[in-house]
Amino acid sequence: MKGILVNYEFCTGCHSCEVACKKHLGLPEGEFGIKVSEIGPYEYEEQPRGSEKWEWTWVPALTKACTLCEDRTEKGKMPMCVQHCQAWCMAYGEIEDLIRHVDEKSRYMILTNRKR
């Protein structure tokens, strides 16, 4: 099974993935294949594990419109969101291979979608 690995610690919230996906799928206003949500900013009274005092994160999520760009990936290309990520914090591949890139130094998530 294939998916997208996101190191969301480095996502800048630029929305390039949203724009590229939306254009590729030809989605109307208000619909998305991938949607970046903002979490924060909020302040910790105590910094967990020596982290920053403030939390301000952007987290991408796939919607039901996402096809993982099957038309592109079948030709060996990357999904549009991965190709256009300005922070280079997204990777596409087999989930088993993506998991090997996960370490304890950063914050990751793996995004998948169901077959239609």
Regions picked out by a protein language model, each given a short descriptive name:
Residues 1-116:
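Non-ligating segments of multi-cofactor redox enzymes
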